[in-house]
Amino acid sequence: MSLTTLGNHPKEEFALVEIATAILTEHKEAMPFSSLVQEIQEFLEVDAETFKSRLSQFYTDLNTDGSFISLGNNEWALRAWYPVDAIDESIHELDDEEDAPKRKKSAKKKVNVFADNASDDDVIDYNDDDPEDEDFGTVTDDDTETDDEETEVEVESDDESNEIDLSDDESIDANMTELSGGDDLDDLSDGDQEK
């Protein structure tokens, strides 16, 4: 399918993946994603802002569609161009190119940080005080004194207003009956009989 074949139908009806397939088929080589997007945008004759809203979905479709393959460095090609063995080799070639310029690192000196040798600067001495603690000074017993004397608080009580007259049982029972809804279910001491 080429761009000329796509020209027979309205451009809006085509999926971006179909247009990308036609563009890659016409170019017959892998293309960077940005170039592919630019050509699709030119084919659809839309401005950048309109196309930008569809860009993330297009990239997702490009990844999930089985007919495209990423060759690294954001270059895309048609999977049909590469047999399965060649795909694996081309990907490993890219990995080998990235690995080649690395230099060997010199071996690091191992240090036992718990050693008893006090002359070594790398040894951690857990018995030393933290130097930041010295900024605040030492705490003495005078600074932490608390009042050992108990403070008495006088509470005035109004005995008459808080006391209940226990001699008037009938008024208490009437109030209790009023609060409980009138049914005396569990108290048989007031003369009620069990039914």
UniProtKB/Swiss-Prot annotation:
Domain HTH HARE-type: 14-81
Ranges of biased composition (kind: Acidic residues): 120-172, 181-195
UniProt GO MF annotations: DNA-directed RNA polymerase activity
Organism lineage string: Bacteria, Bacillati, Bacillota, Bacilli, Lactobacillales
Physiological role: Participates in both the initiation and recycling phases of transcription. In the presence of the delta subunit, RNAP displays an increased specificity of transcription, a decreased affinity for nucleic acids, and an increased efficiency of RNA synthesis because of enhanced recycling.
PROSITE patterns: HTH_HARE
GO cellular component terms, A-Z: DNA-directed RNA polymerase complex
GO biological process, one term: DNA-templated transcription
Protein name: Probable DNA-directed RNA polymerase subunit delta
Cysteine pairs bridged by disulfides in the record: none
Species per Swiss-Prot/TrEMBL record: Leuconostoc mesenteroides subsp. mesenteroides (strain ATCC 8293 / DSM 20343 / BCRC 11652 / CCM 1803 / JCM 6124 / NCDO 523 / NBRC 100496 / NCIMB 8023 / NCTC 12954 / NRRL B-1118 / 37Y)
Domain of life the protein comes from: Bacteria
Assigned keywords, A-Z: DNA-directed RNA polymerase, Nucleotidyltransferase, Transcription, Transferase
Complex and partners: RNAP is composed of a core of 2 alpha, a beta and a beta' subunits. The core is associated with a delta subunit and one of several sigma factors.
Pfam families tied to this protein: HARE-HTH
